[in-house]
Amino acid sequence: MILNDLGVVDYAAAFSLQERIADGVYRNATPETLLLLEHHPVYTIGRAGCEENILDHSIQAIRISRGGDVTFHGPGQLVGYPLINLRPRGCDLRHYLRFLEELLISVVADFGVSAFRVPGKTGVWTDQGKLAAIGVGVRHWVTMHGFAMNVNNDLSSFERINPCGIATCPIASLERLCGCPIAMDEVKSRVAGRFQGLLDEWLPAAGAL
């Protein structure tokens, strides 16, 4: 597994990189990879998305191939794009989604935050609102897209959309929940440290001991 911390990058550049890595993973020419990054401000619209859920068009909106509806990405939000071959791991996309939720729930617990799933909705939630959005796509059973967790970002841009198609969806950030400054590098470190072990626990590869 390769970890690549990209810093703050444009959405289009990150998507192009995902495509190249996913193709390499499919051909067994590239190791599975976790990209961690932040985006410049952008709205993304998933396959189930409706442009009417964007209430303000001052920020670029891009329609993409992940599942889900509309969400916002910007600095201070940790985005993770795992490029994982699910074929030797059982081709179980729903279980993969639950793995991503468990990863983030376990990470924020390190900061004293109690997060949880909501039945029938993909993502990570807290008593104060939704903390992380999750939307994935697959090509030849190689995953693309991933998760976006609010760490220390300005949440006002979420007020100009119906996030994930939910008109009254409150949005939380790790920093607001903790009531103190949270360093992005610390969150990245905890995500990176847990990712491989939890992936192998939830989705063990065929033949793995």
From Swiss-Prot:
GO terms for biological process: protein modification process. It is found in: Cytoplasm. The record marks K130 as: Lowers pKa of active site Cys. Keywords: Acyltransferase, Cytoplasm, Transferase. Its EC number is 2.3.1.181. GO terms for cellular component: cytoplasm. Substrate binds at R66, G67, G68, D69, V70, T71, F72, H73, A133, I134, G135, G146, F147, A148. PROSITE patterns: BPL_LPL_CATALYTIC (PS51733), LIPB (PS01313). Residues 28-203 form the BPL/LPL catalytic domain. It is an enzyme of class 2 (transferase). Gene3D superfamilies: Bira Bifunctional Protein, Domain 2. InterPro entries: aa-tRNA-synth_II/BPL/LPL, BPL_LPL_catalytic, Octanoyltransferase, Octanoyltransferase_CS. Pathway: Protein modification; protein lipoylation via endogenous pathway; protein N(6)-(lipoyl)lysine from octanoyl-[acyl-carrier-protein]: step 1/2. GO terms for molecular function: lipoyl(octanoyl) transferase activity. The active site is at C164 (acyl-thioester intermediate). Catalyzes the transfer of endogenously produced octanoic acid from octanoyl-acyl-carrier-protein onto the lipoyl domains of lipoate-dependent enzymes. Lipoyl-ACP can also act as a substrate although octanoyl-ACP is likely to be the physiological substrate. Belongs to the LipB family. In the reaction, the free carboxyl group of octanoic acid is attached via an amide linkage to the epsilon-amino group of a specific lysine residue of lipoyl domains of lipoate-dependent enzymes. This is Octanoyltransferase. It comes from Pelobacter propionicus (strain DSM 2379 / NBRC 103807 / OttBd1). The gene is lipB.
